């Protein structure tokens, strides 16, 4: 049955066509076939050499409409900073007790923040957090003394992005239930940040291709040049 549903909605998408951003997001919401609230994911292939240290593309942005889901936040902090994190709405705050829980297999959270003085403690679980993209990092604002602000930003739906070894940025930008207009706004915010993050040493075409898809739906290609121009970030 799932195969039949996919085949039925896939007919609505011309796999050879590159759509406008507006067309693409209307299509991706229309062609999300599952009964559950599917995630909407984008993949942007960049014309960079990810092996070069000066051609890394990464950053963090606040999406205008959040991610359409509850974000569970863990904070490694002590004393006044522990209280600050709790007041801001952190789901779990601690130190060695959190390390013990994580070492025991507990990973029921989406984001991890730490104060700088706690990084020696966090390093004990680096091999667990790192491969899952959960390791606190000062470059994306998750190693900070401003834990209250960081928790608030994560709860609102801050998106961390980075290029992978294949030169592609993969990102989830929301849920089907948010509707095409809000998803489009979130995408344009991400795209603008990626355009601004173009490495100075990158030569040739920067945005090579863009595709968007729901969890169970077909991929929809987006015309990259027009989309980038619409961000006003060139």
Swiss-Prot record:
Question: Which domain of life, per UniProt?
Answer: Bacteria
Sorted alphabetically, the Gene Ontology BP terms of this entry are:
regulation of translation; translation
Q: Which Gene Ontology cellular component terms are annotated?
A: cytosolic large ribosomal subunit
The protein's matches in SUPFAM superfamilies, at most eight in alphabetical order, are given as:
Ribosomal protein L1
What are the alphabetically sorted keywords of the record?
A: Repressor, Ribonucleoprotein, Ribosomal protein, RNA-binding, rRNA-binding, Translation regulation, tRNA-binding
Q: Which Gene Ontology molecular function entries are recorded, alphabetically?
A: rRNA binding; structural constituent of ribosome; tRNA binding
Q: Which PROSITE patterns match?
A: RIBOSOMAL_L1 (PS01199)
State the InterPro entries in the record. Ribosom_uL1_bac-type, Ribosomal_uL1, Ribosomal_uL1-like, Ribosomal_uL1/biogenesis, Ribosomal_uL1_3-a/b-sand, Ribosomal_uL1_CS
Please verify whether the record's keywords include tRNA-binding.
yes
Family indicated by similarity = Belongs to the universal ribosomal protein uL1 family.
Record note on quaternary structure: Part of the 50S ribosomal subunit.
Q: What's its job?
A: Binds directly to 23S rRNA. The L1 stalk is quite mobile in the ribosome, and is involved in E site tRNA release.
Q: HAMAP family attached here?
A: Ribosomal_uL1_B (MF_01318_B)
Protein name, UniProt field: Large ribosomal subunit protein uL1
Which source organism does the UniProt entry give?
Answer: Bdellovibrio bacteriovorus (strain ATCC 15356 / DSM 50701 / NCIMB 9529 / HD100)
